[in-house]
């Protein structure tokens, strides 16, 4: 229940979201929490294609939000097209910032924009925008907020550790980090000890920092984030999709400069439900990568497997493996002797007629293993038969795996994934990490050995399971009433409403 006292006018938040699954998922969770626990109106702004996918996938039971959209342009699937990425970000900034201005103007005039969702139109579309929330990679949203003298809040959708790495890079540690990053691809194993962070080598850094990074201008976006925060007249608020027990040292390091509030994990609350999942469980976060209705065959298949015996393999919606790498993964999985459920997206299949040699496909089929184009990930991770998650180490996937108590095999490729893999394997010790050969391919023996390590009930596997269950419990406690994330979220709501909102 929500109590609201008398005071200032109705609060209307504009939440501006980068149009990618890793940003939309936590942003939607935050949006739902805000409208469910307060009288605050909220407009969710992202690209037109993302809004279309969200509206198709949202169940009627989802809390009502207003949705608005901007054009995002086109980003091709080339992994090394720097010009294409620059054009995309420029288009995003141009159309996105103009949409923010238009919405602010229209709500001032009482002409609400956007599409309602749920039971008819969303409520409060005519109330003026009073605050802007924006996700990672959209620093221009804070600039527009300042144009209108509106407060802005950053929703950081990566680990706090990643934020700090960029912060240090642009505030005196650039030369030291460059010395380490320039060792990429060499035998040198130099590391750097940044304040209150784990030792980092070149293989642990965000890919935007590395010489091999194809998107040369991308790192400037993070510099713009810091500049936008520094431009605030009062200590800026940063909401982070993490929790105190998971990144305690990193969160403490943020305190002197930023008002940082861990409100994670921003995942469906049903993840913490101890009841056995079914295929029909509804998620309030549509998957933008889902291109067809889930036939749920995977659920019956999982039901037929022993507890903790299945390897779940998924590398997210944007990571594509080469044919050579896919074949090594297949051989390693088959050699492990464990049943596996492997998500190979339609994007990967579109790269060519064959994702692997036909004889491997036939062997996988003969042994009764399962390959699917899509499945409801958190429902899979909750299933008792799943004992290991081979993951690209996206932040949402990592938080979901921890919340479900499933240890991981880190298979990072780009962005924040190497840093997250470092945290998984060496800081939290809830998984292991693959090592690639000189040619960049992770061999079948490495994959097989990683599986054996995680699935070993008497060796390292036991320790990994104990650790992941510990952090699962700590995450659940953080989200519960009186927990750190619950209290931070409550404080954030009260800050927005002048202390007039209470959560029971």
From Swiss-Prot:
Keywords of this entry: Glycosyltransferase, Transferase
Chain intervals with Gly residues compositional bias: 111-125
Organism: Gentiana triflora
Example of a GO biological process term: anthocyanin-containing compound biosynthetic process
Official protein name in the record: Anthocyanidin 3-O-glucoside 5-O-glucosyltransferase
Tissue-by-tissue expression: Predominantly expressed in petals and weakly in filaments. Not expressed in leaves, stems and other floral organs.
One GO molecular-function entry: hexosyltransferase activity
Broad class of enzyme this protein falls into: transferase
Pathway as given in its UniProt record: Pigment biosynthesis; anthocyanin biosynthesis
Function (record text): Catalyzes the glucosylation at the O-5 position of anthocyanidin 3-glucosides to form anthocyanidin 3,5-di-O-glucosides using UDP-glucose as sugar donor. Anthocyanidin 3,5-di-O-glucosides are molecules that are responsible for pigmentation. Involved in biosynsthesis of accumulate gentiodelphin, a unique polyacylated delphinidin-type anthocyanin, in the petals. Also acts on anthocyanidin 3-O-(6-O-malonylglucoside). Much less active with hydroxycinnamoylglucose derivatives. No activity in the absence of the 3-O-glucoside group.
Gene3D superfamilies in alphabetical order: Glycogen Phosphorylase B
Annotated positions binding UDP-alpha-D-glucose: 157, 377, 392, 395-397, 400, 416-417
Positions annotated to bind an anthocyanidin: 23
Enzyme Commission (EC) number: 2.4.1.298
Classification of source organism: Eukaryota, Viridiplantae, Streptophyta, Embryophyta, Tracheophyta
UniProt xrefs under InterPro entries: UDP_glucos_trans (IPR002213), UDP_glycos_trans_CS (IPR035595)
Catalytic-site annotation from UniProt: 23 (proton acceptor)
Record region (Disordered): 107-126
Family from the record: Belongs to the UDP-glycosyltransferase family.
Stored PANTHER family: GLUCOSYL/GLUCURONOSYL TRANSFERASES, UDP-GLYCOSYLTRANSFERASE 75B1
Enzymatic reactions: an anthocyanidin 3-O-beta-D-glucoside + UDP-alpha-D-glucose = an anthocyanidin 3,5-di-O-beta-D-glucoside + UDP + 2 H(+)
Coiled coil spans: none
Transit peptide as UniProt keyword: no
């Amino acid at each position: 229940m929500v109590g609201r006292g008398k005071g200032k006018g109705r609060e209307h938040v504009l939440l501006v979201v980068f149009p990618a699954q890793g940003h939309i998922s936590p942003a939607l969770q935050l949006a739902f929490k805000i409208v469910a626990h307060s009288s605050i109106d909220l407009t969710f702004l992202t690209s037109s294609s993302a809004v279309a996918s969200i509206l198709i996938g949202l169940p009627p039971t989802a809390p009502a939000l207003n949705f608005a959209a901007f054009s995002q342009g086109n980003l091709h699937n080339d992994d090394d097209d720097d010009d294409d990425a620059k054009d995309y970000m420029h288009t995003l900034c141009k159309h996105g910032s103009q949409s923010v201005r238009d919405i602010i103007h229209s709500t001032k005039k009482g002409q609400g924009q956007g599409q309602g969702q749920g039971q008819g139109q969303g409520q409060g579309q005519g109330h003026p925008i009073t605050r802007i929330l924006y996700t990672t990679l959209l620093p221009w949203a804070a600039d527009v907020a300042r144009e209108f003298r509106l407060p802005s809040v950053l929703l950081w959708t990566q680990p706090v550790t990643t934020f700090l790495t960029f912060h240090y890079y642009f505030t005196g540690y650039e030369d030291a980090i460059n010395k380490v990053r320039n060792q990429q691809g060499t035998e040198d194993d130099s590391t750097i000890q940044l304040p209150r962070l784990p030792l980092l080598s070149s293989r642990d850094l965000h890919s935007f920092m590395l010489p091999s990074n194809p998107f040369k201008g991308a790192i400037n976006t993070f510099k713009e984030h810091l500049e936008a925060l520094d431009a605030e007249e009062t200590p800026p608020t940063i909401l982070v999709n993490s929790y105190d027990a998971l990144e305690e040292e990193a969160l403490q390091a943020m305190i002197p400069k930023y008002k940082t509030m861990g409100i994670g994990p921003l995942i469906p609350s049903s993840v913490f439900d101890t009841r056995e999942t079914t295929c029909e469980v509804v998620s309030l976060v549509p998957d933008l990568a889902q291109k067809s209705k889930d036939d749920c065959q995977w659920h019956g298949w999982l039901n037929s497997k022993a507890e903790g015996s299945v390897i779940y393999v998924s590398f997210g919606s944007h990571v594509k493996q080469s044919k050579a790498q896919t074949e090594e993964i297949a051989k390693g999985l088959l050699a492990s002797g464990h049943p596996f459920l492997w998500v190979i997206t339609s994007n990967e299949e579109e790269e060519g007629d064959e994702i692997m040699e036909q004889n491997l496909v036939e062997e996988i089929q003969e042994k009764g293993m399962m390959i699917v184009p899509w499945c409801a990930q958190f429902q899979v991770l909750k299933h008792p038969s799943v004992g290991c998650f081979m993951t690209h180490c996206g932040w949402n996937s990592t938080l979901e795996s921890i919340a479900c108590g499933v240890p991981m095999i880190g298979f990072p490729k780009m962005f924040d994934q190497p840093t997250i893999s470092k945290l998984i394997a060496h800081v939290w010790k809830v998984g292991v990490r693959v090592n690639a050969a000189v040619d960049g391919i992770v061999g079948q023996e490495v994959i097989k050995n990683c599986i054996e390590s995680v699935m070993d009930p008497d060796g390292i596997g036991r320790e990994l399971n104990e650790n992941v269950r510990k952090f699962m419990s700590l995450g659940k406690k953080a989200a519960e009433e009186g927990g750190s994330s619950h209290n931070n979220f409550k404080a954030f709501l009260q800050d927005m409403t002048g202390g007039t909102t209470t959560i029971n």
